[in-house]
Amino acid sequence: MQSRIVGLAPAFSLFPNLNTPHKTFTFHQILVLIITFTAYASFHASRKPPSIVKSVLGPPSLNSSSIDNGWAPFNGTQGTKRLGELDLAFLSSYALGMYFAGHLGDRIDLRYFLVFGMMGSGILTLVFGLGYWMNVHTLGFYMSVQIVCGLFQSIGWPCVVSVVGNWCGKEKRGLIMGLWNSHTSVGNILGSVIASSVLDFGWGWSFVLPGVLVLVSGVVVFMFLVVSPNDLGFEELGKEIEIEMSLGENVEESLRKHEAEGAVLLENVDDSSFAIGFLEAWRLPGVAPYAFCLFFSKLVAYTFLYWLPYYLRHTAVAGVNLSHKTAGILSTVFDVGGVLGGISAGFISDKIKARALTSITFLALSIPALIMYRVYGSVSMFINIVLMFISGLLVNGPYALITTAVAADLGTQDSIKGNGRALATVTAIIDGTGSVGAALGPLLAGYISSRGWNSVFFMLIVSIFFAGLFLVRLAKSEINTMRSGELIASSVP
């Protein structure tokens, strides 16, 4: 047997019982899902502090011209615009870095690369928080930290999706990745709660604790993560076994044989897979429409991510203005809805085998949900929570589906013969394009909010419309496929 154990994580030397045959394939599969879940949840937890501290750094209200409150240089009449520019600094470098990260991720050890990104992200998050104790009031300092931090953060997503794609086959991929992708919302919730809880002690603490969380998670990844089943001698499920069926073949018997093979030890490891080029990946069927759909979907999701606590702080609910801490914690309801949205979208798309149709349905329903939230969200706390939950469910559903199951499907599709090394590149293209929208959304919100929040919500609704528009052709194709399947089924005696 050709050995691939040299690059195994240190924990497998310290704890020999973790190796095969002491532990099953399923055990390692679950372990990988837990580790990558924790890793990316910590990434998102460290992104949340800027949105929580906005109401502390910026002016007390949109109409205020006072500089007696807040934190220079964000507390003047241009405060909201500068906060939007700060978001742009992080998210634009994140989007740019995403393309390079995916390209590199297909070519170097994913465990080392992921740990490198986590350590850099944790340190830069800590450095931003140090600005509080060092009494830094220079815009360039905070912009520079956010730009470099965005580059480190961009490493995370292509790495974790590629690893999970190696360990999980296409069967129930939507549901599994829908559950797994709740790390985004869980991380947002965790980051919001941590940052809000320590905000009264000084806004610097809101960055320090999430930064430490990323560093600790990075150590766990370095110690335990196994990038591919091949490293333990298992067959890689991301590379689907082709089952050739002719008219005279017993299909049921072939399927049973395929399932019985399961996860078997490899006698020889095939290293023939190759990384595809950036432009070649763009030309893969479905990549461009989903990438541009995610551009607008992520624009909406990240506008909520970065501005919802600020919106809640400056919008009276039942005639009462919320405190900084209450607004930050209340904003987690949107992410709780997002958890259910990602799981629901994955489950439904698995059942009907139509990713685009599922996404476009969620997007269409999110438009009236956002209108209702803006109009009726201030009536009472209960109505605000219910409508925020529904909005989070519908907005994050397609976003979660596209960044996980769809990206994994496109990166392992038949046109590239299941080339697993294309997965990180395809993932980076889709999420990188989405991240350009994510950078644009919070920036526009910072400028448009000076005209009133109705203008911001109008921008979000228009963005959702365009997101759905890019999937119309794919959805029509899926509907035709479903109808063809029904006709074939009805013709069978």
Swiss-Prot record:
Lineage, top ranks: Eukaryota, Viridiplantae, Streptophyta, Embryophyta, Tracheophyta
Keyword Isomerase on entry: no
Membrane topology: Multi-pass membrane protein
GO biological process: phosphate ion homeostasis
Domain of life (superkingdom): Eukaryota
SUPFAM superfamilies assigned: MFS general substrate transporter
The keyword Manganese belongs to this UniProt entry's keyword annotation: no
Organism: Arabidopsis thaliana (Mouse-ear cress)
Protein name per the record: Putative glycerol-3-phosphate transporter 5
GO MF annotation list: glucose 6-phosphate:phosphate antiporter activity
Disulfide-bond pairs as recorded: none
Subcellular location: Membrane
Positions of transmembrane segments: 25-44, 83-103, 113-133, 145-165, 185-205, 207-227, 292-312, 328-348, 352-372, 375-395, 428-448, 452-472
Gene Ontology cellular component terms for the protein in this record: membrane
